[in-house]
Amino acid sequence: MARYLRYLAPLILFLLLAGLLYRGLSLDPKVVPSPLIGKPMPVFTLPLLSDPNATISDTDLRGKVTALNIWATWCVSCRAEHEVLLELAQTGKVDIYGLNYKDKRADAQRWLRQLGDPYIANAFDADGRTGIDWGVYGAPETFIMDKQGIIRHKHIGPLTRTDILNELLPLIARLEAED
């Protein structure tokens, strides 16, 4: 009996590890649970990217369905996502606000002048503290809020046309239909 256990124990351990590996490989890396889903957006007041003497706050994003896109000029994926954000903004189906994250103001302003500006307004989060309040892991990330300012969706990584068509636009339409 002890002889069989000596061979059975490594087999059981191997099967357990193989099962854990299979489970880990089947997870979608874009799906990271956020404790903020279903909760009010964090309270914030930040200077505008375009004017350091003016501010934008969480109250500016309430009363309508909005998207908040966290981006930076140092973020390679943000550049790939930018064209898709411009297309989404042109549809007029959602107001997109930006949060420029841990960046240099002049670099970010130049970026928007050269590539186009899909945002209604841009908050400037130079030190990243507001991004931390939002649970940001890195850029880009996009949040969708309902009319009451409740976070309903978080997308990690660059948005694609497929993401917008299959995830965001149906969600936005559903949120717009709510009272």
Predicted features, each with a name:
Residues 1-47, 179:
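N-terminal targeting signals for export/organelle localization
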Residues 3-7, 13-14, 79-80, 136, ...:
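Hydrophobic alpha-helical transmembrane segments of integral membrane proteins
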Residues 25-27, 47-53, 122-125:
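Short gly/ser/thr-rich secondary-structure transition/capping motifs
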Residues 44-67:
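A short beta-strand-turn-helix
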Residues 64-66, 70-74, 138:
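Short pre-active-site segment immediately N-terminal to redox-active cysteine/selenocysteine motifs
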Residues 67-69, 98, 144:
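Hydrophobic beta-strand core positions in alpha/beta domains
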Residues 79-116, 126-132:
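Structural microenvironment flanking redox-active thiols in thiol-disulfide oxidoreductases
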Residues 113-118, 125-176:
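Thiol/disulfide oxidoreductase modules built on the thioredoxin-like
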